[in-house]
Amino acid sequence: MIKRLLLQHSLRLLRGCDLTEIYLGGGLIKNPVGGHDSVYRAEVVGKTGVKAKIVAYSVSKSGQRIVTFELEYPRTIHSEVRTHCMLDMNASSSRAIPMKFMRDHVLENTAFPVVLTKNQSGMQGRELHDGWIDLNVIADVYKHKVKTVVNFLKGSGAEFDEEGLRISFNNYIKYWVLSAVTADHEVLERSGLHKQVVNRLLEPYQYIKTIVTGTEFDNFFNLRFQEDADPTIIELANLMAYLYYNTEPEELSWKEWHTPYVLHERDVSGKLHYFVRNEAGEKEYLSGGRDGDAVKVSCCACAQVSYRKLDTSPEKVQRVYDLLINGGIIHGSAFSHVACPMCSMSASIVDGESVNMPVLPKTWQDGITHMDRQGNLWSSKFKGWIQYRKLIPNENCVSFDYEKRKQEVYSTVVGSQLTQLGGG
């Protein structure tokens, strides 16, 4: 049903979205971008630089799909993307990005809205704005003379209509607004403030990169690929849906793993092998299985979404892994993107034993968390797939000691500045 609605709406909405670049578009996308050894199966680029890439796309023998996207979109719509609780996500953090790099990145890759509409009541504009900003309005708001505004824009190198005394929305943001915001950003940096405070100033103009994995995308497409949604998230959902319905998933069997950023190949016997490329471009094969290096490398790669360059070297992987799992508090979200098919979606016999009998939870595979009213077995948010996170002991804290933690936090430099509750 959702696929049919997407196809019905696609021509109308594409006029507003205007896809600018599609890799391997037209028909099923069977080959990865950049060849069979690329970490990306397919990629599509839309207006204003919104991007969707498929990192891994798998289907079980029973036909249940799981897909991992790498997305880039304006941070302004991130809260709306995050409302979809059936999808697991990791996102780049302003707290992890050096300030100078953030400033340069925002100036070079400013995040703009996909569509500009005129103001009216309600959440959605229905009439297109021409995108021109009146220099007289700028002068009036800032209490400048128009000549002062004109001279500033000339000095900044901005293109604008001097005769008509107007400037495009994008150039206004880039040359007027960001000239002030980035200057303030640098002032705060040079004053010694931490990037977790300073970088927040630039978030409205920043692209965010996210890793999104799920087995259930119908509701996301249904809510976000329709005309009442924010135009920028319509664009994002459109790109994702295009790839989802036009890319051929890789079939995986029980005990074979969906591993974003870790590549697969089968030998003549049909056995699946896992590998990554080192800096020299050579294949480095990784052990498979639940406790293998392929799973570990994939999880750590997903955790590197804030990094400028993916690093799957053993040294980097070990450092990231230790930060995620060996620091006393488990940061489990990066382990949510790796999964393997359930041995069966219903009761079956495996190695002479009854497995996954719906009414007998003790027969369920490790990692299965619940059954829905239709009798489908789930592992957290994944239907028909075992999420690796659910195989990690203590991945979810169920015995938080507030009084103990309160003492630990209050004794730190930052904690000493918080509201001290309960007598310390």
Question: Model features per residue range: what roles?
Answer:
Residues 1-424:
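A conserved ligand/cofactor-binding region detector
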